[in-house]
Amino acid sequence: LAKDTAKLHEVTKKKCLSSKVEVKKLYNDAFDSLILVNHFRFGPAEAKQRYFALAFWPDTKARTPKILNKFLISNGSDILSLDQYQQISVAGRGFYAMEYLLYDETISKKPNKKRLCGLLTVITEDISKTAKEIFNEWTTSYSKKILIVDQGSIYSSEKEVVQELYKSLRTGLQFTADTRIGRPLGRSNKPRPKRAEAYRSSRSMRHITLALTASKDLAINLSKKDPNIT
């Protein structure tokens, strides 16, 4: 995820105005990487609301379009700096904000392409920075707290670590069932397709597949030491 988002930022910064197709490809690659780890929302991802800054969804009050359009229609010429951008609501940050800017049909009618690309660039910079922070904390400190249980660990026993991982597995499966699948299906006589995750970019089914694949891999790894599970 950290590598893919860094590449996404570099290409967006250099080619947003000239090659939107390439930006979209790298965006989708990075989004895949996020969904494959989306069930690990504890630890470094939970700290400082990092996961929500990457993936604010569902957006039940349509806050993302409101926030982004406010910047797009602004009369000012200044582009937001990263520090300024990180002060706004998480609803205006991350992959779903970027999806709106890249795929929403109304955005193509906005006249100021330079302003749009400026916003996309700062979004990818924020995404890349956040993903790197999560990766660095996992690899330099948090992984040790999971692998080595001692007085300095946040877990009191190996059993507690396993419980945290099972909780992550259960929460991920429930989110996919209730939110990714159940929410857009609605009632039998009234489906709500625009409630589907990432519907603008036609990624909804892909997210379900990737999330279930990641959950399956975690379940298999957790059950390897249990002779009662095959």
Model-predicted segments: where are they?
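Mature extracytoplasmic or organellar-lumen-exposed domains after removal of signal/transit peptides
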Residues: 1-230
